[in-house]
Amino acid sequence: MSVFQSGFHPEQIAVKIPLWREILLLHELTKLRSDPVFRGNGIPRGNGAAVITIPGFLCSDNYTAYLTKWLNQIGYRAFPSGIEQNNDCIQRALQRLLPTIENAYAETNGKVHLIGHSLGGVLARIAATNHPEKIASIITLGSPFRGIRAHSLILRLSDKARSKIQSDQPHCFTGFCECPSVAALRTALPPEVRHCAIYTKTDGVVDWNACLGDETNHEVKGTHSGLVFSAEVYRLLADWLQ
């Protein structure tokens, strides 16, 4: 993993990756809707545990609605994150996620699984580091929790978002921020929290090397944007959540 051996590297670096491939997410959605896994066939049934889905950068819970609905259908108590649009300061986004975790924990009387796409997975890791007593596991889908290595367009969008939300904090949305959330990324995940990192080597948004965990990693085919619409990912989730 070269520079991604451990910890969270603060520098944002533009990488040359095939952003144009992301349009193929429409094909992935079509394939998912016709796949037996979307109807719950050929996979283990859920055990009623709480699962929270967390959208990626610039996205809302509408983007993960297919996944949330599917999790409910196969036997889990699935909750949207409650973040609204994920384009705010990461510390403030976390503060909106935490009540959802508290609610899911209370309603099911058990630890919660967090499934985060891209930046949503980064938030999941922060939440699990800070509150391991309430988190059973995290599943990250193309989440660059080792450092922001992304297509130049994504970095420009990040810069634009930062200029609007934290003009008084120039390092917001970067690894140089001194907020508690970024500090949590530099801390090892508590051993009692399981972590499954799912990634694709044809990611057109972030460098897939930045998405690898220390233990369980699963490579899938497809796009970054399409990870929440991937039948292959859904099968992995059904097995992992058991």
Give names to the regions the model predicted.
Residues 1-52, 59-70, 74, 81, ...:
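Flexible, membrane-associating and regulatory peripheral segments of lipid-active enzymes
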Residues 2-9, 18-21, 159, 168, ...:
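Alpha/beta hydrolase fold serine-hydrolase catalytic domain that processes acyl esters and thioesters
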Residues 24, 30, 155, 183-186, ...:
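Generic detector of well-ordered alpha-helical segments enriched in charged/polar residues
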Residues 29-35, 41, 60, 86, ...:
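Surface-exposed loop/turn and secondary-structure junction residues enriched for glycine/proline
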Residues 45-46, 133, 192-194:
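Short hydrophobic "helix-edge" motifs at membrane interfaces and signal-peptide entry regions
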Residues 50-62, 66, 72-189:
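Serine-dependent carboxylesterase/thioesterase catalytic core
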Residues 189-242:
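C-terminal catalytic-base region of ester-bond hydrolases, centering on the histidine
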